[in-house]
Amino acid sequence: MRIIFAGTPDFAARALEELQKAGLDIVLTLTQPDRPAGRGMKMQASPVKILAQQYDIPLLQPETLKSSDIQAQLATFKPDVMIVAAYGLLLPEAVLRIPRHGCINIHASLLPRWRGAAPIQRALLEGDTETGISIMQMNQGLDTGAVLLKRSLPIEPYDTTATLHDKLADLGGKCIVEALTLLDQGRLISEPQNEVDACYAAKIRKIEAEIDWTCDAAYIDRMIRTFDPHPGAFTHLQGNTIKLWQARIVSHVNHNSSHQAGKIITVDPDGIVVACGRDALSIDILQKAGGKKLTAAQFLAGHPLHPGESFHKATQDNQGASET
């Protein structure tokens, strides 16, 4: 089976690695052009490009797939199937028709739940107890194609977007190998998605990561884990932006008055306990703008805090602290 693989970030590279290990015939890899990244804004190759070069797989980096020239070039490879994983470019209908078996997508959710750009973050933020990988036949819609294979995994109470990403990337690689094996055997069954159950995972906006302390502690805890590693859940204190990276729910603390939300209840090297709309959070790891991530004990050694002080949103900050 002749395969074109299209993907860009680490999530896609792990799938490419699994396909390569399985000995499948990858005739071409597509990935986005090199982009400036990092503090020095130097041009960097994508993880998929690096891996393709490591395995000497032919590589193309088009800016778009809309041109007839690139479409004609893809057709010369006579692909049986194109595998797409977090590629980042739109696939025109003409491209979808090139492979004999069409284009198959590796999507990081249990479709039809969480179609769209940020399925991992949305599942975590909304408190889903499980997520998974859907192998989907691509069409012109946004993740609306028939599901060919689906595998689930639990979302653990300690999971962050980073840990969940890694679990799903590994699962995605295994799933696509399984799906292609079934396809080759003529045993891959497609199932249309139920539109009634569909919901969309909109792209994450930075402003969503600002903590509203009137929310309950369980939701704020999920925020902290959802926005790890990017952009980092943040709040404000004494004119400074503070990012929170790890916290624990303190359920035996009960605060019914909304004006208490964000107030520091106790200050302890083991954690800074802050009142929420319901229950409280013990902040274990935090970071001042421009600084390093610190445990509560390390932070307090250089930034003494006292019960009664309050974390709050930027709109409550007279000094107008900016986001980082």
Curated annotation (Swiss-Prot):
It comes from the Bacteria. Attaches a formyl group to the free amino group of methionyl-tRNA(fMet). The formyl group appears to play a dual role in the initiator identity of N-formylmethionyl-tRNA by promoting its recognition by IF2 and preventing the misappropriation of this tRNA by the elongation apparatus. Keywords: Protein biosynthesis, Transferase. It is an enzyme of class 2 (transferase). InterPro entries: Fmt, Formyl_trans_C, Formyl_trans_C_sf, Formyl_transf_N, Formyl_transf_N_sf, Formyl_transferase-like_C_sf, Met-tRNA-FMT_C, Met-tRNA-FMT_N. It catalyses: L-methionyl-tRNA(fMet) + (6R)-10-formyltetrahydrofolate = N-formyl-L-methionyl-tRNA(fMet) + (6S)-5,6,7,8-tetrahydrofolate + H(+). The keyword Membrane does not apply. The gene is fmt. This is Methionyl-tRNA formyltransferase. GO terms for cellular component: cytosol.
